[in-house]
Amino acid sequence: MMAALPLVLIAAVADNGVIGDDNRLIWRLKTDLRRFRSLTLGRPVVMGRKTYLSIGKPLPGRETIVLTRDPAFRPEGVRTAADLDAALSLARQVGAAMGADSVTVAGGADVYRQVLPLADRLELTFVHARPAGDALFPEWDRSAFIADAPENHPAGPDDEHAFTFATFRRRA
């Protein structure tokens, strides 16, 4: 039997833990959006219903799987699942069929909270700002992960805040 595809959680988190406000992103970071695209392209992407609605459409070149408790929620071009186990099972099946090397998870806060204990890798963007917001990244145990060297980026024309890309791999 083939090993399960690794589970990769992807998030942008402000210095104060905020990840969004009123169901939307609260910063403009084109460099981070390009990284998100490269991390998810050709892979299944699991997200909650509110996150999907904030994006408003399926992500091109990816298989979008939306977690929802509403059986009537069936947007065109995405798959839905009623709970995390079903979503991850579907994502792993779809990922294996499409030749993906991982399953990615793109939020929101409640989905992150459920996935953190299961994630093999975290791909985090630490946004160096302290915005107001109503969605927070959950507390997590950094000692359970090994950090790769961080990649710092200054604010610039395409990025309204300085930020750091950081990869964390779960300890064996």
Give, region by region, the residue ranges found by the protein language model:
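Enzymes that bind and transform nitrogen-containing heteroaromatic metabolites
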Residues: 2-172
